[in-house]
Amino acid sequence: MFLPSVLAASNLVKVQPGLIFWTLVTFVIAAVVLKWKAWGPILSLVEEREKQIASSIESAKRERAEAEKLLADQKTAIAEARREAAEMMRRNTQEMEKFREELMAKSRKEAEELKLSARREIDEQKAKAIAEVRSMAVDLAMEVAGKLISERMDDSKQRALAEQFVQGLPLNSTSATGAVRRTA
């Protein structure tokens, strides 16, 4: 309602062929001037911006690829370092075990040698003690036999004489090694 009355009153909405012509001429002149003076610089700015964006994208891709490569290299280096550390620990454990076994074998050997040496010494002392006791027994038997032969006696006198002779001998005691020692 209101719109048709406004449109009817206005001269701007009326189609006027002269106005259309001059509007088209002005538009074409403006388009030619813009194309001639402004279109080139605008297009070059747009192209330059496109190149800059493409360059930034390529640079970002390269940097990302480089970062991924560095990350992979670091992961590989860390894995290698862990592997080397594990190998070193394994080697050290083996060497420590070998050293412990060698030390135990050496200790056993030394203990066995000490044991054998002590046993030899004990056997020597025992042999000396037995030889000494035998020598004393022979001497005693010879003395008793000599006295018995020199004096003919009855059994009670012989026993008394043997006891008297034995009492005159120095006392003997046996040590822990089995050796006989004379004491006063």
UniProtKB/Swiss-Prot annotation:
Record-linked InterPro entries: ATP_synth_b/b'su_bac/chlpt (IPR002146), ATP_synth_F0_bsu_bac (IPR005864), ATP_synthase_B_chain (IPR050059)
Gene Ontology CC annotations of this record: plasma membrane; proton-transporting ATP synthase complex
Main location: membrane
NCBIfam families registered for this protein in UniProt: ATP_synt_b
Free-text function comment from the UniProt entry: F(1)F(0) ATP synthase produces ATP from ADP in the presence of a proton or sodium gradient. F-type ATPases consist of two structural domains, F(1) containing the extramembraneous catalytic core and F(0) containing the membrane proton channel, linked together by a central stalk and a peripheral stalk. During catalysis, ATP synthesis in the catalytic domain of F(1) is coupled via a rotary mechanism of the central stalk subunits to proton translocation. Component of the F(0) channel, it forms part of the peripheral stalk, linking F(1) to F(0).
Family designation: Belongs to the ATPase B chain family.
Protein name per Swiss-Prot or TrEMBL: ATP synthase subunit b
Originating organism: Myxococcus xanthus (strain DK1622)
Protein's gene: atpF
